[in-house]
Amino acid sequence: MGAAHSASEEVRELEGKTGFSSDQIEQLHRRFKQLSGDQPTIRKENFNNVPDLELNPIRSKIVRAFFDNRNLRKGSSGLADEINFEDFLTIMSYFRPIDTTLGEEQVELSRKEKLKFLFHMYDSDSDGRITLEEYRNVVEELLSGNPHIEKESARSIADGAMMEAASVCVGQMEPDQVYEGITFEDFLKIWQGIDIETKMHIRFLNMETIALCH
């Protein structure tokens, strides 16, 4: 009786922290146990057995995001060696559809949280800025599966996108002015008016039994 009460209290606490329902938490817990091999924590190598990740060109960045202390709200840099179920839920909550019944301020806060998660995937050195080199790395990874696009072409695409970002965020630049990279404030400007919902989903975890959209 006491154990059952304690478990339900824990679920309610997780509901409050992540926004998932008790049914969703139960289903995600089954998936967590499947990934971890029934262990209390997950390590990076546990993601090697996720079929939907195998062919994803930015697989390494997706997996890394699960262990990024910034996303886990445990610090401003560094990676965790392993994550527990609550950590797993924290990361999964970034992919949860925004509840549009919330107030405007809360909806905007949820959107910013999602964009911060994406920003961290680009900002690999945790310095608060996406440099040209970091952006090139992402574009090269994204296009690595396309045999018709050479590395130099991928770099040109990244360079062009960075120039466009500079024009959006800084405006007209002087000939000798150097754009040092995209800050999170810049990132918000770039994503203004873009539907973040269509860019972030959880199919890569192959959760065929889970319906996160109601």
Curated annotation (Swiss-Prot):
Q: Where does Ca(2+) bind?
A: D123, D125, D127, R129, E134
Q: Which GO terms describe its cellular component?
A: cytoplasm; cytosol; lamellipodium; nucleoplasm; nucleus; plasma membrane; ruffle; ruffle membrane
**Tell me, what's a Pfam family for it?**
EF-hand_6
Q: What is one Gene Ontology biological process annotated in the Swiss-Prot or TrEMBL record?
A: protein maturation
Its record classes its membrane topology as: Lipid-anchor
What tissues harbor this protein?
Expressed in embryonic, newborn and adult testis, but not in prepubertal testis. Expressed in the embryonic testis during testis determination but is not expressed at any time in the embryonic ovary. In embryonic testis, expression is restricted to the testis cords and is seen in both Sertoli cells and germ cells. Expression is excluded from the myoid cells which surround the cords. Expressed in the embryonic adrenal after the initial stages of differentiation. Expressed at a lower level in the embryonic brain, heart and lung but not in liver or gut.
- State the deletion phenotype: According PubMed:22285131, mice show a normal number of megakaryocytes and platelets.
Q: Where is the lipid attached (N-myristoyl glycine)?
A: G2
- What are the boundaries of the region Disordered? 1-20
Keywords for the protein's UniProt record, in alphabetical order:
Calcium, Cell membrane, Cell projection, Cytoplasm, Differentiation, Disulfide bond, Lipoprotein, Membrane, Metal-binding, Myristate, Nucleus, Protein kinase inhibitor, Protein transport, Transport
Compositional bias (Basic and acidic residues): 7-16
Question: Where is the protein found, in the record's own terms?
Answer: Nucleus; Cytoplasm; Membrane; Cell membrane
Keyword Transcription attached = no
Q: Which GO terms describe its molecular function?
A: calcium ion binding; magnesium ion binding; phosphatase inhibitor activity; protein homodimerization activity; protein kinase inhibitor activity
User: What does this chain do?
Assistant: Functions as an integral cofactor in cell pH regulation by controlling plasma membrane-type Na(+)/H(+) exchange activity. Promotes the maturation, transport, cell surface stability and exchange activity of SLC9A1/NHE1 at the plasma membrane. Promotes the induction of hematopoietic stem cell differentiation toward megakaryocytic lineage. Essential for the coupling of ERK cascade activation with the expression of ETS family genes in megakaryocytic differentiation. Also involved in granulocytic differentiation in a ERK-dependent manner. Inhibits the phosphatase activity of calcineurin.
The record, for PANTHER family, names: CALCINEURIN B HOMOLOGOUS PROTEIN 3 (PTHR46823)
The record's note on quaternary structure and interaction partners says: Monomer. Homodimer; disulfide-linked. Interacts with SLC9A1/NHE1; the interaction enables an optimal Na(+)/H(+) exchange activity.
* Stated name of the protein: Calcineurin B homologous protein 3
